[in-house]
């Protein structure tokens, strides 16, 4: 394993390890109570395993996801990727990195969620992002060689001290309404993993990783696939350690019901409170500055990776507009949305993610299946269409806009996983229909 692979692996870790990866694991640990392990393992499944799979599947075709999705439908490829890139880009994920950075670096110092302070902070934050992203050829090196080592050292220090401070405590009762059995906890952890947005971000990051591997002189698809897999495993191991560690510490932190009620009444994010408490308990007044460094580095690396990926994709489909112009446009959009505040950004993203995630997971698995089992285009189109329509109606019903009895009666609906058995049935149906349709099996470009 050469130095380039390590740099790419660390870069991928840093791009994945952003705002949600910090605040969701300790929150999950607190809420899961006695059912921590099924919850955190499910969170790891959607927060790490699926993103890793998403990255390496993107290396199966010479043209990446653009080429693989074109096999399903060229129009679907463009529409789906635009939705993906906007979701994990300027509409939700990038603004969240800025608002999280503010809430965990500035708010503990000024003791308020001042909109003016947020405005000033986001201006400075996105100027730094702009500087790093303007030269895409240096993006990997700047993140992997400079920012990631600092991020790993600082967060490791906080995890070790947090474990020493809180591991002796017994786990709290947690949120018993959601976490009342092994299965309910697994299902809740699985859907909580959606909020990291990493499984759909993997589709975007795959392009950056594959391009970085190519820049090292590797051109054959099989070798690109192996290097991408190795880099992905490096990132995954680091993420698994950090997720479980932060979740475990959160699971053993004593937080009273009164404190939780106060946080909710002040619109404070509970995950950020847990991290702040962890840092201040372990390092005193210096803790908030240590946490600030961790958050700033984690969010900054993710924001840079996302801005770079989104801008490269849109420049590719609209070549008349330069990469730098797209960088400026998406940073401006992210700046505007970030100023709505952290909880607002998270709340806005949940319905969209509930539609996009099932489709993204289905697409990634269908591409992987087609690599090993002869698959016709119609066999991929049917499950994608069915899961997409089902996800839309599921969100409509969950939001209360229209009560759909059929949706509410589906298996696993109580756990927001009703799409999964439907996806399996739709995939089988697609293959049966494919038997009677005259189409050539899908072949991914290797050279």
Curated annotation (Swiss-Prot):
Subcellular location: Cell membrane
Topological category with respect to the lipid bilayer: Multi-pass membrane protein
GO BP, sorted A to Z: isoleucine transport; L-leucine transport
GO CC, alphabetical: plasma membrane
Keywords: Amino-acid transport, Cell membrane, Membrane, Transmembrane, Transmembrane helix, Transport
InterPro entries xrefs: Brnchd-chn_aa_trnsp_Livcs
Family recorded in the similarity comment: Belongs to the branched chain amino acid transporter family.
NCBIfam families the UniProt entry points to: livcs (TIGR00796)
Name under which the protein is recorded: Putative branched-chain amino acid carrier protein SAB1263c
Source organism of the structure: Staphylococcus aureus (strain bovine RF122 / ET3-1)
